[in-house]
């Protein structure tokens, strides 16, 4: 079996390096050394070494709740984490145990990895898979990650592998001085993998990368959960910051589409998912997201802004009885770029569509601010300094100051 997987494993590492996701030799060596296929029993080795996320557990309604993350974003986050030999690392979200194994390789025999998951079955499976892969130095614990794991603190590095709505105080409190916390932070529905450094009285971002993860469950669960729309299985709306919305009215509006507007603005998929999505989230409190899964895609209610296998998603402005959603690409657009459109739904949908189009043009006119220049500072909720030049997002525990 070793000979069978060496080639596809090496090919994956080369692919990640060529794309810029792997940038250091120690991260490359971790991916070469750790056998992903042993953490995905039942998956063909060739599939295990594809640069794709693989769902490993679903809820009864079909929504995925655990997976082996896409290697590209795993590599990005490990580069952000900047793990050194001998360090103590806390991971929130064990999943299959593959990422914990990569971390164990990075810290070496003088370091230690503690990994937490809320599901007993996942922890037990991960323990077995770590043992089968010959990985030592990992303590896999069934616990709610919101509280961290005080027994192993302080940690030089903390990494969260599920989308976090807030920065939990326990993660910060268990982080060593000048330690680093990497987490997929949800900002009104847009996810960013943020590498924070712990300073005297706050966390300061050192790098930001767009990402997409399943949400944390348990005490730190995101109130921006997907809400089902109507009686169509697989149709959901993500509401920002627990915004009150008449879901039945939105479902009715989706059955009343209007004529699509064109913005004339050409974009790439990455720009839509991250840069434009973040601009809308920060500039309009009515921004939200529509998602269709499985058979709901065929109902053609959600404009196919971005499509993944088994899922279609778009960003929208949500009104009381109407909405407007970003739409595209059309079939004649080149694969790497398309002109974005705006589709109104329901009464007053045209007004929302014009407002949404204005945001697209404003983002374009501002030079399409990217995550490379994004700065995020996280303070305890009531301890942040006044800074009128920043966007301010308040969470239950944290005040985020955001600027480009």
Predicted regions and their residues:
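Class I SAM-dependent transferase core
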Residues: 1-95, 99-102, 106, 122, ...
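Short, ordered beta-strand-loop transition motifs
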Residues: 58-60, 199-200, 330-335
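Conserved nucleotide-cofactor-binding alpha/beta core module
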Residues: 79-182, 186-193
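Class I SAM-binding transferase module
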Residues: 165-311, 400-403
């Amino acid at each position: 079996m070793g000979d069978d997987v060496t080639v596809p494993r090496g090919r994956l590492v080369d692919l990640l390096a060529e794309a810029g996701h792997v940038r250091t030799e120690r991260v490359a060596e971790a991916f070469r050394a750790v056998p992903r296929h042993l953490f995905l029993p039942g998956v063909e080795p060739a599939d295990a070494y594809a640069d794709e996320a693989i769902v490993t557990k679903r809820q009864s309604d079909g929504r995925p709740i655990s997976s082996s993350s896409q290697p590209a974003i795993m590599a990005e986050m490990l580069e952000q984490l900047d793990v050194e030999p001998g360090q103590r690392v806390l991971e929130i979200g064990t999943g299959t145990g593959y990422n914990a194994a990569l971390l164990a390789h990075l810290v070496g025999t003088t370091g230690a990895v503690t990994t937490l998951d809320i599901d007993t079955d996942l922890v037990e499976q991960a323990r077995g898979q770590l043992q089968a892969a010959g990985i030592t130095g990992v303590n896999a614990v069934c616990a709610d990650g919101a509280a961290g794991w005080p027994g192993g603190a302080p940690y030089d590095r903390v990494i969260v592998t599920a989308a976090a709505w807030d920065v939990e105080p326990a993660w910060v409190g268990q982080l060593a001085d000048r330690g680093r916390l990497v987490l997929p932070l949800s900002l009104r529905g847009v996810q960013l993998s943020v590498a924070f450094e712990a300073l005297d009285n706050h966390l300061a971002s050192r790098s930001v990368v767009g990402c997409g993860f399943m949400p944390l469950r348990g005490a730190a669960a995101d109130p921006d959960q997907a809400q089902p729309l109507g009686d169509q299985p697989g149709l959901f709306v993500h509401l920002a910051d627990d915004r009150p919305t008449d879901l039945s009215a939105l479902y009715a509006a989706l059955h009343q589409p209007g004529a699509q507007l064109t913005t004339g603005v050409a974009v790439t998929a990455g720009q839509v998912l991250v840069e434009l999505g973040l601009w809308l989230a920060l500039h309009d409190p009515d921004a939200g997201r529509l998602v269709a899964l499985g058979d709901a895609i065929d109902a053609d209610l959600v404009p196919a802004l971005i499509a993944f296998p088994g899922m279609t998603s778009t960003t929208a402005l949500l009104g009381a009885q109407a909405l407007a959603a970003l739409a595209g690409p059309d079939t004649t657009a080149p694969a790497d770029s398309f002109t974005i459109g705006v589709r109104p739904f329901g009464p007053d949908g045209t007004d929302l569509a014009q407002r949404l189009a204005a945001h697209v043009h404003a983002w374009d006119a501002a030079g399409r601010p990217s995550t490379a220049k994004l700065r995020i500072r996280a303070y305890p909720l009531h301890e942040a300094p006044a800074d009128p030049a920043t966007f301010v997002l308040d969470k239950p525990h944290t005040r985020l100051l955001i600027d480009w």
